[in-house]
Structures are given as C-alpha cells and as structure tokens.
Amino acid sequence: MGNIQDLDPHIPNKLGEWNIFADTAAAKDVIASGVPLTMVPLDVTKHIQVTEQFYNELSDLAERNGKTAVSLAYNLIKALKIAFEKEHPEINFFDVYYLWDPFAAMVALEPQIAKIEEKYIKVDLQTGKTEEVSGSGEGIGHVRVAMDIAKPAPEILHHLLEAIASLTPPDMKHEAVTVPPFTLFGSNKGGTPELANRDFKPGI
C-alpha cells in the first residue's frame, strides 16, 4: 500500500502510511529492489468508502446466499462496525471506513480499475514518508503507482459485490468470535500504539 507525499493537495500527508511506517527499512529495500511493484497509495483508497448502501447490499446478499463468502465478508465488516462504534460512538462508521486493503488487492488483480503511472519512488527512513523523486538512484525504485480510480466508486463497489457473490469456498464454518477493542484514531484502552497518518481524516 503506502502513500505518496501530497499526491492529493487537498489531503496533506505529514506522516508515513502505517504499513511502511512500521518497517521503513524493509519498505525501502523492497521498493528499491527492482522487483516489479504496483503501489496503491492510501490517498487513492479513500475513494472506495464503505457506504451505508454498500453495507446494506452486502447484508441482503448474505441473507439470500446463506453460508458463503458473502456472509463471511458481511460478518467481518459487521464485527468491525460494532467494535468501532463501541470505541467511537461519536463517529459515524460510514464516514471514516474505507476498503483500503481490499481495493489494493482488486488493483493487483484488475489494474484497469485504477489510473496507473510509472514513478520513481523513495522511502525516507527518518519519517517513513513515501515520496516521488525526479529520477533513478541508490535507494530509489521505479514503481507503478495507482494515481486515481479509473471507474466510478459505486461501479467498483458493485463489481466487488458480484465478485464476492461468485465465490463458493468449501466447508465454510461460522463461529462466534470476539473482536478485540481497536481504534483508528490514536491509542485505545489496551495500549495499542497510535497509528501513523493521523492527519489523514477520514479514512486512515
């Protein structure tokens, strides 16, 4: 995933995206390795929001399809929603929750849903920032970067619903699980470290 410093001038990024911030040295090595990479910045995933309409459509599909991948996806998002609302009752879940990783996976499988450009990218070991630079050099990678979505967000979400509905994993078992307390906005009561990119609201 990652993010590009000031990819969107309306959303200033002063901190590194969490996945890169957590291990900047490894991120720098991977990006500069020469391995073919496609980066889907956090800035771009903000377009793919878990809307109330998407949530309700997923709920309806789960009810009609029984114990399938649809119900698994719905139960996962439902559990996240319940846990989030317990920790942050003052915040509307649908205002701040995005399909960060699912959209990155979608781009990996179907890159045509994103507007992709080739960029020279480096990772700053001190700040964790992922930045575009003017040319190649030591510690710099030549990376394909998703700069924006290539289709309307509702169309992408509908396509995701269709893809999930088409999956029929064998022997799926649904068991009650307890989602531990978590937060998107700083440390929770359990002492989880504060995540990076706190200035990026909503959708960190």
Pin down the residues of each PLM region.
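Conserved phosphate- and dinucleotide-binding cores of soluble alpha/beta proteins
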Residues: P9-H10, A22, G34
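Conformational coupling and interaction surfaces
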Residues: W18-F21, A25, L37-I204
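Class I SAM-dependent methyltransferase SAM-binding "motif I" and its flanking Rossmann-like core
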Residues: M1-L15
